[in-house]
Amino acid sequence: MKGLILVGGYGTRLRPLTLTLPKPLVEFGNRPMILHQIEALAKAGVTDIVLAVNYRPEVMVSTLKKYEAEYGVTITFSVEEEPLGTAGPLKLAEKVLKKDDTPIFVLNSDVICDYPFQELADFHKTSGGKATIVATKVDEPSKYGVIVHDRDTPNLIDRFVEKPVEFVGNRINAGLYILNPSVIDLIEMKPTSIEKETFPILVENKELYSFDLEGYWMDVGQPKDFLSGTVLYLTALSKKEPKKLCNEKFIHGGNVLVDPSAKIHPSALIGPNVVIGPNVVVGEGARIQRSVLLSNSEVKDHAWVKSTIVGWNSRIGKWARTDGITVLGDDVEIKNEVYVNGAKVLPHKSISSNVEHEAIIM
């Protein structure tokens, strides 16, 4: 089988982190985001993976090529000269994706979940449709495009309703699909939306089905959702692979993932819902909640870090406090006793006075 990961462009929603690394290489759960997907695809028997990119492919090539041998897959970069939307990349990579008649997994690189690729492939084969969308249930369907099913045929999609005013269902497109190679014949070589231009054709021909996703799901393409997705990921890890989580005495509230190379003072309080990356240093009496500390960062004595993504090589000073979905880019310094609330701080900046309201610090 084959897989296409829609990597896309600049990752502006996740700035300032993506000013340093392309979004797929930003660590989620201490591993590059895209590695979670490559591993899951390989586990389901995928042998050819295409990464559809239009921004800084050269940075990703060297990093991702080493995973080919590790996971027994061939990774091809399909570089768009202009953004081709969500369907155009399938046409651009047609040579690889249509080399045999096995189905193609398609997924957005921002999506984190329990990737049900094997179950999806089995369902797709049984349904007899040309394509299957993975659907996830949401609490507020009025914010999304909702899937409405055929009354007579289970899982057959009848139509999509964009941001419905009245309740018509609570299942939405989760950004994962499986397609027969023949679907590529419906796509033109131009910027095209698979959701708005390709799927309606399949719906009209009664060839599009949905598969219900069990477990967690999150689009982690922006900081608020990156942190929420981290909570969901750690919760899933606590149920499936609890030994991966830290259980040292400094853990407070559980669900903490710590790289073995991190140095944490025994008097610190860490948790719940924290990821601490390689070579991170946490000082005496520091308090960290619902945050991600990327590699080589430091939280000094008695600092309080909450709802924060601390970028690579960044430093939070003694008695400083961060909160309110704060994101520090690469090599940022928060001086001692400074309060930062909801700021996005670009790389190589030093903050020496309080930031009390949401702001972008350039």
UniProtKB/Swiss-Prot annotation:
EC number: 2.7.7.13
Catalytic activity: alpha-D-mannose 1-phosphate + GTP + H(+) = GDP-alpha-D-mannose + diphosphate
Pathway: Nucleotide-sugar biosynthesis; GDP-alpha-D-mannose biosynthesis; GDP-alpha-D-mannose from alpha-D-mannose 1-phosphate (GTP route): step 1/1
Keyword Secreted applies: no
Location within or outside the cell: Cytoplasm
InterPro entries (alphabetical): GMPPB_C, GMPPB_N, Mannose-1P_guanyltransferase, NTP_transferase_dom, Nucleotide-diphossugar_trans
Keywords (A to Z) from UniProt: Cell cycle, Cytoplasm, GTP-binding, Nucleotide-binding, Nucleotidyltransferase, Transferase
Keyword Glycoprotein on entry: no
Superkingdom field: Eukaryota
GO MF assignments: GTP binding; mannose-1-phosphate guanylyltransferase (GTP) activity
GO cellular component: cytoplasm
An example Gene Ontology biological process: GDP-mannose biosynthetic process
Family classification: Belongs to the transferase hexapeptide repeat family.
Biological role: Involved in cell wall synthesis where it is required for glycosylation. Involved in cell cycle progression through cell-size checkpoint.
The name this protein goes by in its record: Mannose-1-phosphate guanyltransferase
Species this protein is from: Debaryomyces hansenii (strain ATCC 36239 / CBS 767 / BCRC 21394 / JCM 1990 / NBRC 0083 / IGC 2968) (Yeast)
Gene behind the chain: MPG1
